[in-house]
């Protein structure tokens, strides 16, 4: 976390002893980073949000997507999940989103996306976000996104990953 106050709060709330840490995504040395199967990332939305100036990649915050792409290229996780504001879809007449999808596809990933609203998943607020999912194993196509409206009972089993084990709890999920 680049923001010193947010970093401090995170360390107060969570036990971070022994965690791998880098306070700025632009300075990550991927060879020092542990391997992983799933990369979950968000890049700053201000550059794409209708509430902001919508400067896109001309805004330094907008270029952080390319740092995420660098991590994906260097570490080659089986999956990635990215999140941002729906304004990303229409920014620069869709060219920005096309660049993002093309960049991820050129890295060898199958890429899907969908706009989801938190209110449809038991969260007491309406907050739309675009989710971008990528995976190396083509057998996952159509099994991650789109998915039906959440009912709080279970997740699908996906194939791939380094352990090849189930990635859902057999007893299902409870509503929040």
Please describe what each predicted stretch is.
Residues 28-38, 46-176:
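Class I S-adenosyl-L-methionine
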Residues 43:
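Glycine-rich, N-terminal phosphate-binding loop of Rossmann-like dinucleotide-binding domains
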């Amino acid at each position: 976390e680049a923001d010193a106050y947010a970093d401090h709060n995170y360390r107060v709330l969570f036990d971070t002893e022994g965690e791998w840490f880098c306070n700025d995504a632009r300075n990550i040395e991927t060879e020092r980073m542990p391997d992983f199967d799933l990369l979950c990332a968000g890049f700053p939305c201000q550059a794409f949000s209708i509430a902001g100036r919508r400067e896109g990649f001309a805004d330094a915050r907008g270029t952080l997507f390319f740092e995420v792409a660098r991590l994906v290229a260097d570490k080659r996780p089986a999956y990635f999940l990215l999140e941002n504001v729906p304004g990303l879809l229409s920014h620069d007449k869709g060219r920005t989103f096309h660049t993002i999808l093309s960049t991820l596809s050129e890295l060898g990933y199958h890429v899907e996306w969908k706009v989801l609203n938190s209110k449809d998943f038991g969260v007491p607020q309406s907050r739309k976000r675009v989710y971008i999912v990528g995976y190396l194993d083509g057998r996952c196509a159509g099994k991650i996104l789109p998915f039906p409206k959440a009912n709080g009972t279970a997740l699908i089993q996906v194939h791939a990953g380094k352990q090849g084990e189930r990635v859902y709890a057999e007893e299902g999920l409870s509503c929040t």
